[in-house]
Amino acid sequence: ELSVAKLLEKLKVDDIKHQYYFYGDDTISVNKELYNFLETNVPYLISMVSSDFSKITLADIKEDNAEEEIIIPDPAHEPTIGVIDTLFDENVYFGNWVENVDYLDEIEKLMDKGKDRTHGTAISSIIVDGPRLNPWLDDGCGRFKVRHFGVCAERISTVKLMKKIKEIIANNSDIHVWNLSLGTDDEVSKNFISYDAAVLDELQAQKNIVFVISGTNDNRSTKNGILRVGSPADSLNSIVVNSVRRDGTPASYSRKGNILSFFNKPDVSYYGGDYNERIKVYTSNGEMNEYGTSFAAPWISRKLCYLIDVVGLPREVAKALIIDSAAGWEYKLGAYKNKDILGYGVIPIDISRILSSESREIRFIVYGTSQSYKTTNYAIPVPRDDENKYPYIARATMCYFPDCSRAQGVDYTNRELSMKFGRVKPNGQIDDINENIQDEEGLHADERQSRKEFRKWENTKFISKVLKANRPIVSYGERLWGISVISKERLSSQMEKDLNFGAVITLREVNGINRIEDFIKACTLRGWIVSEIDVENQIDVYNTNQEEIVFD
């Protein structure tokens, strides 16, 4: 098989006249003349075409002319969120909280000299001090430090942006959460993932990071139908955020998924304002009012960083908690009808609502590694009522970060983890709450059913069992409840590496009885070590770990 490099050499392409750049083994960036030459002589070579420019769309801005001096304490041990955006103005009141890097080459510095720094500064203002600017959006997460990489002033080519992001990630391994509020006006393809989204997915499969990406805006003056999202909002491993108004309805500029006609994007929604109810930000010009998905995403970056860096949860569990809190019990009851625009739903404002559960609920976290075909734990002692029945409705959310292959088109993800959760039947099989019959002997689910009903090949799984009559379900003798995670590889190669997954499971007592202590006791008797998440204690642990020890 002839490589692309050898083919270009064989075609006698003049690399001085026609400059081109390789990004991986099968992706090149070319100018228009070379593209036309290749299209004429080797049309089979061009299987996927990406738009060359990511245009950063700035929302309408309304000045607030606030002149009062704002006092902010110096940063201490707060965690750091990475921001990749337009340039940052170091002269704003929270400048000490931002480690700013103008990530520009010499030519870009000359071209961008004196350019506007509004957008990038506004994004970092939400991450650092968003609750002070918008008291009604106080999430209880406090302030965050920012490492801000200004990669452009207004426009940047997709391949150049991704090259910069690769370098930035490689040199800043201490940061786990990255905010990317940039995107294209062009709709993503129905047939393949965009180049920039594929790069972000690859980075997240390889490294312990999560990108939070804005769902992009519809900036047309006349809207004829709803546009699909622009890249890189088709990134599968990232958390893609769309925007809603204060009442939870989609913003007027909302764009939609799904991706490749299947994958659920956006993931979630949050408050990003609208033309007549804007979000307060701070820029070089003082306080301003803006709207857009760009200003919804940073709030989710705050929550995600809090869960990972302060509470100490793995990224897979943190993402599952975010998704689960958005879906709640309402998703299966009808909210799923708006999934193309709202994703799994609107995330609660207060972080405590993500980390806590109601008194009648039992919620627990499972974090594990898929090392083989099946990863199973059957010993989950769910409490029964006086009639020896299980008086619960249940839901579960699982997230993982698989390797992906853009060249496979719609068959994008390489690895599938299928989850079952429910009562263990006498034959040892799990009576799954989602009636998942995949991989059961004697039963068959075709590919269409597996994708539609069980979300096969999707890296976020949400399953729920809601009993309309709220009747308790029978127990199978002394059997317990179980979790089964089954791994499948799309490609013919064997599974070469372990894949971490995080699951959040919630049981709600239909009669409103608090059975959490019974659950903890039963788990302890079976040898489980049960650790309740104490947020205040985790904050103390985090602060202690950040203290510097000076040896005499």
Regions found by a protein language model. Name each.
Residues 1-73:
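Autoinhibitory propeptides
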Residues 87-95, 228-305:
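Extracellular S/T/G-rich loop segment that most often corresponds to the catalytic His/Ser-adjacent loop
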Residues 151-231, 290-291, 295-296:
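Substrate-binding/access-modulating region of protease and related hydrolase catalytic domains
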Residues 311-391:
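C-terminal subdomain of the subtilisin-like protease fold in secreted/lumenal serine endopeptidases
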Residues 412-426, 472-473, 477-552:
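C-terminal edge strands of extracellular/lumenal beta-sandwich accessory domains
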